[in-house]
């Protein structure tokens, strides 16, 4: 229903316009207060790169963060990552991730980024506190913040926006009548706009999510996902249909697709109940970090990597690297 409202297919969005105007008024006032100096943002002693969205819902932001961290690491840059830690609840904040940190504490995306990149990761509702925790514990040269484009309390040097190339900005309205956190005109002030799928427009960086081999949660074995049979697909991400479409494009045709809420807590019994005898469960890598502790032999995940094309990605990386002292 929300997808139909935000796309404009359902006329119900009009009923939510008063709330959207209020949202837009408040969010605009907050941004203006920082722009005019009525409120002061905290500036870290190292460059800060924000990777965020203008819209609610999954746009492919986490793969972009992983891509950026890995590319900077390849250039010899010491990178730290901070996040709000949505879906997690730690005993105390800020929380520096360790190999023992669970998704229940830190959230699924920070754990995934930590496992994939090995970079220091810290979570806290106040991102400045997370940055300070990393700087106190690690000699990093740059901070990447996973989400937080609208978190103006943290000053930033580079802003990168990730856009869903198919859904774009839906009906163009602020939350809750539409998907917008800020107006589309905000794109004029960011350093880069990365478009996940669809057709990139002038000045935007095209990106595709490239699937790898399916990985068994229990054994780590790998195989072409199309070789798996009787698949039940599960996706607890911002936009589950994208994952299901990826499976179809890989030649894996699920018997059943189970969309879950983003950052949803997964109970072992609930996940186990999705799969019948002779069936195979295939999930996203983000779901896998939540399920690995209780995985069955027939559970697999399909990793995806961001693939950015054209000359702009290298120019962006050069610009970011030039900020490192």
Curated annotation (Swiss-Prot):
Top-rank lineage group of the source organism: Bacteria
Catalytic activity: a lipid A disaccharide + ATP = a lipid IVA + ADP + H(+)
Alphabetical list of InterPro entries matching this protein: LpxK, P-loop_NTPase
EC number: 2.7.1.130
Sample GO molecular function, one term: tetraacyldisaccharide 4'-kinase activity
GO cellular component: plasma membrane
Keyword Iron: no
SUPFAM superfamilies membership: P-loop containing nucleoside triphosphate hydrolases
Sites where the protein binds ATP: 55-62
Any one GO BP annotation for this protein: lipid A biosynthetic process
Coiled-coil residue spans: none
A Pfam family recorded for this sequence: LpxK
Entry keyword set: ATP-binding, Kinase, Lipid A biosynthesis, Lipid biosynthesis, Lipid metabolism, Nucleotide-binding, Transferase
Record pathway: Glycolipid biosynthesis; lipid IV(A) biosynthesis; lipid IV(A) from (3R)-3-hydroxytetradecanoyl-[acyl-carrier-protein] and UDP-N-acetyl-alpha-D-glucosamine: step 6/6
Family of the protein in this entry: Belongs to the LpxK family.
Function per UniProt: Transfers the gamma-phosphate of ATP to the 4'-position of a tetraacyldisaccharide 1-phosphate intermediate (termed DS-1-P) to form tetraacyldisaccharide 1,4'-bis-phosphate (lipid IVA).
Name the UniProt record assigns to this protein: Tetraacyldisaccharide 4'-kinase
Species of origin: Salmonella newport (strain SL254)
